[in-house]
C-alpha cells in the first residue's frame, strides 16, 4: 500500500521520451517506444509506502493560510491535507511546499531521533523518505498554485 500524490498541472507539459522503455518510478507501468516520441503530461505523480507514516507523525511542521500559521506534523500535510483545511481551503502546491520544507529541515536536524521509526519490515526508510520529500517539494515549487490530490 502506498500514498499516491498527484500535482495537476495548469497547462500540459511536453516531454520527449527517447526510444526504448519509459515507466513510472515504481515500475508498475512501462511502455516501449520504437522511436523518440513527444508526449503531453497533465500531472506529476509520486508514491511512497504507507510504512513511512509513523515517521511522518513524529516530524513537526507548520503551514500558513491567509497569513495564519497552523502547527501540524508531516503526516497530516502529506497523508490527510483535507482534514487540516489544506484540501478544503487551498490544497495547492504553495501551502504544501511550506509544510514539506519545514518538515525536511526538522528531519535533517533530527536524523538520529527519527531512525527509530524506520519500518521493521524494511519497506521504506529515512534514507528513502527524505529524497522523496525533496522531489515532492521541488515539484511543488516548480508548479506554483497547482492543485494536489492524494490517494491513500
Role assignments for model-derived ranges:
Residues 1-152:
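Acidic (Asp/Glu-rich) sequence patches and key acidic residues
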Amino acid at each position: 500500500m502506498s500514498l499516491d500524490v498527484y500535482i495537476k498541472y495548469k497547462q500540459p507539459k511536453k516531454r520527449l521520451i527517447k526510444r526504448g522503455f519509459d515507466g513510472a518510478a515504481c515500475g508498475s507501468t512501462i511502455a516501449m517506444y520504437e522511436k523518440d516520441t513527444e508526449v503531453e503530461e497533465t500531472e506529476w505523480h509520486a508514491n511512497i509506502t504507507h510504512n513511512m507514516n509513523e515517521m511522518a507523525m513524529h516530524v513537526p511542521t507548520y503551514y500558513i493560510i491567509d497569513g495564519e500559521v497552523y502547527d501540524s506534523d508531516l503526516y497530516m500535510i502529506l497523508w490527510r491535507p483535507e482534514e487540516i483545511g489544506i484540501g478544503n481551503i487551498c490544497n495547492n502546491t504553495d501551502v504544501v511546499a511550506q509544510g514539506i520544507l519545514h518538515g525536511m529541515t526538522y528531519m535533517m536536524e533530527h536524523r538520529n531521533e527519527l531512525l527509530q521509526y524506520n519500518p521493521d519490515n524494511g519497506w521504506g526508510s529515512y534514507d528513502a523518505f527524505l529524497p522523496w520529500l525533496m522531489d515532492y517539494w521541488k515539484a511543488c515549487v516548480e508548479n506554483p498554485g497547482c492543485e494536489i490530490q492524494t490517494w491513500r
